[in-house]
Amino acid sequence: MADPKYADLPGIARNEPDVYETSDLPEDDQAEFDAEELSSTSVEHIIVNPNAAYDKFKDKRVGTKGLDFSDRIGKTKRTGYESGDYEMLGEGLGVKETPQQKYQRLLHEVQELTTEVEKIKTTVKESATEEKLTPVVLAKQLAALKQQLVASHLEKLLGPDAAINLADPDGALAKRLLLQLEATKSSKGSSGGKATAGAPPDSSLVTYELHSRPEQDKFSQAAKVAELEKRLTELEATVRCDQDAQNPLSAGLQGACLMETVELLQAKVSALDLAVLDQVEARLQSVLGKVNEIAKHKASVEDADTQNKVHQLYETIQRWSPVASTLPELVQRLVTIKQLHEQAMQFGQLLTHLDTTQQMMASSLKDNTALLTQVQTTMRENLATVEGNFASIDARMKRLGK
């Protein structure tokens, strides 16, 4: 029996099964929930494409030659993996930089310095204090230093005598080539053809390879032609006037191009000659007379047609007058005949239903007659069997009584 102190508490359901409710999901469904997306601007959402990453690092190997990740006791640092855009050596490694590594390091440092100077130029305000290097002057010096670095890189590729202006590298290379040719000609003239057959070839000779790209030339030529056609189309669209349907002078002046429009205008202007105008005026006078005759004939024809239609309408009304008097009686008779037709249709449906019912009853009687005949035959057979059984029982009783 329950404790009586809980008998009169509010909110207790009596004579009902106990139900324990909770807002939590079952244990099997607790892990299945949608992750709450972070909408903060401080969180950077990075979309990673696994297929692209796999294609980028496919068939790549990590070189472990010269690497040492073991612990150390001395002051010498061990060589581990180095990562970055450029391979730059740290201090104290005891490894000498190659010229390529030194050039990349200097170029990277100049780029970092340029970025810092640009930040200073945007943030620092004008001040009255005098400085030795202002951000503007420092930026100019950095640009010159970067140009020198790039020029030194080109000198390493093209030779120590390469003096190329970065503003126009193609023109500078052409000038350099002409200077080399002039120097070669002067050296040949000074030698005077005294070289012997067994003498080695002159090492100061310069060999150039000219690479022509006809596809690039064709592409640039096609681009220029397309640009010219585009400008010509814009010019034609600007000069060409839109055709006005209300203006008879502008009819037929919508040419496909500017030349066609000019030819059409020239043909129209040539049609304004005095001799041509006299011929046109004579033709217009004859045409005007014919038009007036056609208008008069058309008016007479229209009047005759109107009179004919009026006579036909009057005859139709005369024929309709006796029919109109008998129309109400005809409508009443048609309504009565409609009701008779509906009753006849219902009677026909009843006859059809009665015929169908009679056929069903006849078929049922045939089935019942067949069943009755079968039952009578079965009863006769059963009665004969019962009589035979009683006769055999009487015979046995008589034998037993004797």
Curated annotation (Swiss-Prot):
The keyword Membrane applies. The modification Phosphoserine is found at residues 83, 321. The modification Phosphotyrosine is found at residues 6, 86. Residues 1-27 are annotated as: Disordered. It is found in: Cytoplasm, Cytoskeleton, Microtubule organizing center, Centrosome; Membrane. It is a peripheral membrane protein. The modification Phosphothreonine is found at residue 134. GO terms for biological process: melanosome transport; mitotic metaphase chromosome alignment; mitotic spindle organization; protein localization to centrosome. GO terms for cellular component: centrosome; cytoplasm; dynactin complex; dynein complex; growth cone; kinetochore; membrane; microtubule. Its main location: cytoplasm. Residues 18-27 have a biased composition (Acidic residues). Subunit of dynactin, a multiprotein complex part of a tripartite complex with dynein and a adapter, such as BICDL1, BICD2 or HOOK3. The dynactin complex is built around ACTR1A/ACTB filament and consists of an actin-related filament composed of a shoulder domain, a pointed end and a barbed end. Its length is defined by its flexible shoulder domain. The soulder is composed of 2 DCTN1 subunits, 4 DCTN2 and 2 DCTN3. The 4 DCNT2 (via N-terminus) bind the ACTR1A filament and act as molecular rulers to determine the length. Part of the dynactin complex that activates the molecular motor dynein for ultra-processive transport along microtubules. In the dynactin soulder domain, binds the ACTR1A filament and acts as a molecular ruler to determine the length. Modulates cytoplasmic dynein binding to an organelle, and plays a role in prometaphase chromosome alignment and spindle organization during mitosis. Involved in anchoring microtubules to centrosomes. May play a role in synapse formation during brain development. This is Dynactin subunit 2. It comes from Mus musculus (Mouse). The lineage of its organism: Eukaryota, Metazoa, Chordata, Craniata, Vertebrata.
